[in-house]
């Protein structure tokens, strides 16, 4: 089918926006120009002068299916991603059953094939059942379609296990993706160790819990040559360790989540589970280090860590609520409003971190508006300001601390392989 997206604007170098129309055909971008004859197309969509970007790429989401479908499903999670402008997402393996064999992984892909409205790439675990010290069969999992290997939700606690996993992943040319958390340093913590945790009388999580395991893993990554990717970096020390590793030529990449760029522990209003996440919100110096890390290339990309939970679960106290907040439907709006509108980031940088770079570092055919590339496209309204309304989410979950925040940059349309996956007009 020949599809036209007309009257849009795309980013050129030096952050210039130019008028553009996109000709989509056979699932790819066939041509980009100022305008085309509408009579030549079977479908025409009007961008009304708004921003056209490559579809965003999120390398860190939790879709909860199978096993926890009262929180989220592949269908609702992928719709949430599409509503946020994401066309490719990578789903974590903390499921039930854990997809730790080729057969179980194939079953998850069957669900994805049936229900997903965006491209969903599934991670496989590093160890059986996530918490064991028994390595999975990485070769078989790769053949079954594993995107990369991770035990996200828990850190691999034993250095020897991590070393062997890295060695195997390197041999298979696969990435090893790490949730970094030394459990021996947790001490039951539920939020950042600092003045706020003391004020609320809650056990804190040391910054060293994260940075110490990153330092260990980087040493092992140097030894094995694996592509080592650090999930949701949150501390100043972690940024320093990653920066030093990159300077030393070690193949390490890293992501940061929007909430860690925007919020700090001082923003937490009280003992409210909607503010509980892992890693926790850190201090002002940590947040600035994350911003600086993006700007100097230490941190490669922005990933949401979309983590849906049931409402009753998150309405509990910090001690009892599960970790995590949703982020797919708010990520671009929050980053655009808080950083581009304020002049801290450029629009080009944001698209780089949310589309181009995540695709590049994992070798995905995504994140680009070029002739012949997959027609994975988002259209954003940069002009209209509106409050975030969790009740309007496509996600089953509403666990966000950003409800009521006024933001710009809502998604108007999302296309996957040239087909309309989500549009505001259709809602």
UniProtKB/Swiss-Prot annotation:
Keyword ATP-binding: no
Record: residues binding Zn(2+) 2: 152, 179, 232
Cofactor binding notes: Binds 2 Zn(2+) ions per subunit.
GO biological-process terms attached to the record: 'de novo' UMP biosynthetic process; purine nucleobase catabolic process
Pathway annotation from the record: Pyrimidine metabolism; UMP biosynthesis via de novo pathway; (S)-dihydroorotate from bicarbonate: step 3/3
Reactions listed under catalytic activity: (S)-dihydroorotate + H2O = N-carbamoyl-L-aspartate + H(+)
Example GO molecular function: allantoinase activity
Named cofactor requirement(s): Zn(2+)
Active site feature: 305
Entry-linked PROSITE patterns: DIHYDROOROTASE_1, DIHYDROOROTASE_2
Organism superkingdom: Bacteria
Enzyme class: hydrolase
Chain residues that bind Zn(2+) 1: 60, 62, 152, 305
Keywords: Hydrolase, Metal-binding, Pyrimidine biosynthesis, Zinc
InterPro entries: Amidohydro-rel, DHOase, DHOase/Allantoinase_Hydrolase, Dihydroorotase_CS, Metal-dep_hydrolase_composite, Metal_Hydrolase
Binding, substrate: 62-64, 94, 278, 309, 323-324
Function: Catalyzes the reversible cyclization of carbamoyl aspartate to dihydroorotate.
Protein name, per record: Dihydroorotase
Protein source organism: Enterococcus faecalis (strain ATCC 700802 / V583)
């Amino acid at each position: 089918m020949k599809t036209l997206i007309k009257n849009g604007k795309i980013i050129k170098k030096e952050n210039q926006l130019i008028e553009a129309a996109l000709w989509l055909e056979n699932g790819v971008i066939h041509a980009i120009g100022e305008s085309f004859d509408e009579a030549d197309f079977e479908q025409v969509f009007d961008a009304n002068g708004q921003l056209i970007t490559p579809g965003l790429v999120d390398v860190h989401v939790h879709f909860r299916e199978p096993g926890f479908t009262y929180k989220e499903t592949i269908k609702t999670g992928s719709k949430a991603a599409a509503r946020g402008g994401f066309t490719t997402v990578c789903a974590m393996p903390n499921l039930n059953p854990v997809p730790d064999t080729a057969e179980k992984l194939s079953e998850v892909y069957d669900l994805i094939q049936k229900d997903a409205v965006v491209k969903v790439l599934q991670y496989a675990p590093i160890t059986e059942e996530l918490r064991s010290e028994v390595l999975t069969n990485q070769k078989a999992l790769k053949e079954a379609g594993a995107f990369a290997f991770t035990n996200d939700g828990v850190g691999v606690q034993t250095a020897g296990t991590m070393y062997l996993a890295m060695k195997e992943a390197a041999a298979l040319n696969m990435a090893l993706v790490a949730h970094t958390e030394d459990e021996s340093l947790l001490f039951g913590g539920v939020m950042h160790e600092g003045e706020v945790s003391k004020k609320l009388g809650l056990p804190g999580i040391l910054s060293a819990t994260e940075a110490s395991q990153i330092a260990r893993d980087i040493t092992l990554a140097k030894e094995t040559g694996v592509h080592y990717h650090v999930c949701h970096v949150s501390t100043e020390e972690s940024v320093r360790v990653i920066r030093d590793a990159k300077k030393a030529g070690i193949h390490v990449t890293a992501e940061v989540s929007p909430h860690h760029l925007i919020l700090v522990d001082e923003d937490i209003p009280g003992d409210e589970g909607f503010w509980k996440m892992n890693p926790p919100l850190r201090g002002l110096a940590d947040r600035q280090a994350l911003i600086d890390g993006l700007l100097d290339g230490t941190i490669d990309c922005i990933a949401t860590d979309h983590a849906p939970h049931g409402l009753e679960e998150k309405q509990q106290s910090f001690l009892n609520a599960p970790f995590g907040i949703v982020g797919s439907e708010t990520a671009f709006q929050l980053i655009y409003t808080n950083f581009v509108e304020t002049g801290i980031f450029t629009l080009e940088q944001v698209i780089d971190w949310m589309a181009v770079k995540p695709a590049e570092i994992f070798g995905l055919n995504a994140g680009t508006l070029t002739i012949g590339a997959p027609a994975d496209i988002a259209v954003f309204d940069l002009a209209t300001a509106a409050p975030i309304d969790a009740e309007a989410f496509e996600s089953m979950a509403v666990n966000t601390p950003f409800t009521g925040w006024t933001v710009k940059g809502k998604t108007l349309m999302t296309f996957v392989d040239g087909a309309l996956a989500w549009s505001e007009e259709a809602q």
